[in-house]
Amino acid sequence: MPPVLRTVAELRARVSDWKAAGETVGVVPTMGALHEGHLSLARRARAACDRVIVTIFVNPRQFNNPADLEKYPRTEAQDAALLASVGVDAVFAPGPEEVYPRGFATNVSVSGVSEPLEGAHRPGHFDGVATVVAKLFGMTRADRAFFGEKDWQQLMVVQRLVADLNIPVTIEGCATVREADGLALSSRNRRLSVEGRARAPALVRAMQAAAEAMRGGRAIPEALAEARAAVLAAGFETVDYLELRTADLLLPMERLQGEGRLLAAATLDGVRLIDNIPV
């Protein structure tokens, strides 16, 4: 089993030894409740770096709903066993007081790319993400960091963060891992009922149909409206957004020109699912 480090001091001592030996360090930031998507990131890190750290920290600052924070699954023993199978070198699993000690007063806010979509529906969420990610990069001194494309907006926020603050880490975006029926892997999926799980792939199917329609010349507003209607017809309770945006800055796209991204968030069984695909 990989060692589970609880303090910044332990982590820094370990990383200092690796750096002194000239080894490269990769980090995979997670909130635990690991699944095959996380493991694919760890494998990618394992292939690219001499040493791999996976962080497990349920970050209270990125939850704007306390009930969501409470419900978030915590499965550290299972997570460590899964990571052992991948061969990671260390797990960093600090408590909240280690990351945010008494008197902590700094907030990192990335404007622009963090504001629409998830930012509009979850105020403060990306400030919490940016703050903890900036801290993790400082703590781990990572050369590379691995993030899933499933959280596309988060990936864009992190890329902007490291560019603007000159943080010397390379951000690697890794393809979304999906179930056989197309559902994007997510720690939240385990909260779906059996019936909800069967309905959940309707989200990505509607998105794929919209992308195909737009490529075929369908007007963008019509294609998006049809996709939203299809998601609701499949049994989802709400659609927070289903929008076409530029891939990098997440600006609204009026026509297909350059790289676009179709991003969606919808609620099923009271569980908020997000997804995105290239267009």
Curated annotation (Swiss-Prot):
Protein name in UniProt: Pantothenate synthetase
Subunit description: Homodimer.
Additional note from the record: The reaction proceeds by a bi uni uni bi ping pong mechanism.
Pathway: Cofactor biosynthesis; (R)-pantothenate biosynthesis; (R)-pantothenate from (R)-pantoate and beta-alanine: step 1/1
Bilayer-crossing regions: none
Keywords per UniProt: ATP-binding, Cytoplasm, Ligase, Nucleotide-binding, Pantothenate biosynthesis
InterPro entries: Cyt_trans-like, Pantoate_ligase, Pantoate_ligase_C, Rossmann-like_a/b/a_fold
S-S pairs: none
SUPFAM superfamilies, A to Z: Nucleotidylyl transferase
Protein family (similarity comment): Belongs to the pantothenate synthetase family.
Catalysed reactions listed for this entry: (R)-pantoate + beta-alanine + ATP = (R)-pantothenate + AMP + diphosphate + H(+)
UniProt cross-references to Pfam families, sorted A to Z: Pantoate_ligase (PF02569)
GO MF terms, alphabetically ordered: ATP binding; pantoate-beta-alanine ligase activity
Main subcellular location of this protein, as a coarse class: cytoplasm
Native source species: Cereibacter sphaeroides (strain ATCC 17023 / DSM 158 / JCM 6121 / CCUG 31486 / LMG 2827 / NBRC 12203 / NCIMB 8253 / ATH 2.4.1.) (Rhodobacter sphaeroides)
Binding site for (R)-pantoate: 62, 154
Biological role: Catalyzes the condensation of pantoate with beta-alanine in an ATP-dependent reaction via a pantoyl-adenylate intermediate.
Gene Ontology biological-process annotations: pantothenate biosynthetic process
